[in-house]
């Protein structure tokens, strides 16, 4: 009983301090998330290689990928890859690694994870190699981070971004295109 009273007292103290801090700073917990457009990028894809019933590997082709935005522009170079894990729910969990060479020669490593949830219709279209757009896929969000030694792009080392799929096509002429936003 004594431990329960102490635990309640500690909880009340911590809660009071948190509420007092919010009142002093004028910053209550906010659920608003702001984003800033960073770039659009496109990466050409090979057909997936099924490793087993739950793992697909998609090779990012060595040429043809690009990134364009107000503060950054370049092309994707090797190495790059896209691992897709099929979850028991049917959702796909992504693990992607890519290298961007900017137009001024800087190298930026991009790594992201995310989730794709297909509807029966979007899965069928994807399996047929048809073009899918944002409106076709119920949920396709990834969260990239960046690493670079370039002083010009060092600010990327300190931001979290989100990708929203724009287009996806598998099979012949396959590619993925994202709009990328910095989370503020």
What annotation goes with each model-predicted range?
Residues 22-28:
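Sec/Tat signal peptide C-region and signal peptidase I cleavage site
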Residues 9-22:
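Bacterial N-terminal signal peptides
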Residues 1-7:
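N-terminal secretory signal peptides that target proteins for export/translocation
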Residues 28-184:
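Beta-strand-enriched cores of mature, soluble protein domains
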